């Protein structure tokens, strides 16, 4: 466990000497678990772009601090801004507004339609 602590850290892969250690290049790697994405997975590098992204293909689209209004906590990169915090179609969508925290507000054909849906229902005259 204590062999080459400065070079290896807690690495479990002898093929990636010095690339997995927590104490080597902390600014570049951070806690990366993927040696192919050097410097793209670390928590301390590009916090505004990556945040806590787990998908290297969606650079900067998954971070909690980037585009919070567009992505929210969406788990589906194909539904940008349409999911809010919903991770499954059918749970909370179409109930909070239309999509929750969607970046695109519900579109009404006419202003009167919006007034009718948002107005408090009045008692029918007797």
From Swiss-Prot:
Residues 1-126 are annotated as: Disordered. It comes from Anemonia sulcata (Mediterranean snakelocks sea anemone). GO terms for biological process: neuropeptide signaling pathway. This is LWamide neuropeptides. It comes from the Eukaryota. GO terms for cellular component: extracellular region. Belongs to the LWamide neuropeptide family. Keywords: Amidation, Cleavage on pair of basic residues, Neuropeptide, Repeat, Secreted. Metamorphosin A may be part of an internal signaling system involved in control of metamorphosis. The keyword Protease does not apply. The modification Tryptophan amide is found at residues 8, 20, 29, 41, 50, 62, 71, 83, 99. Residues 1-2, 11-15, 32-36, 53-57, 74-78, 86-93, 102-126 form a propeptide. Residues 107-116 have a biased composition (Basic and acidic residues).
């Amino acid at each position: 466990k204590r062999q080459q602590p400065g070079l290896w850290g807690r690495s479990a892969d002898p093929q990636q000497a010095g690339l997995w250690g927590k104490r080597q290049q902390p600014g570049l790697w951070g806690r990366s678990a993927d040696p192919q994405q050097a410097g793209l997975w670390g928590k301390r590098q590009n916090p505004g772009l990556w945040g806590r992204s787990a998908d290297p293909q969606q650079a900067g689209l998954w971070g909690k601090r980037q585009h919070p209004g567009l992505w929210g906590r969406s788990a589906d990169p194909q539904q940008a801004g349409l999911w809010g915090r919903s991770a499954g179609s059918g749970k909370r969508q179409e109930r909070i507004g239309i999509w929750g925290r969607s970046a695109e507000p519900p579109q009404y054909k006419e202003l009167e339609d919006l007034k009718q849906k948002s107005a408090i229902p009045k008692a029918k005259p007797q």
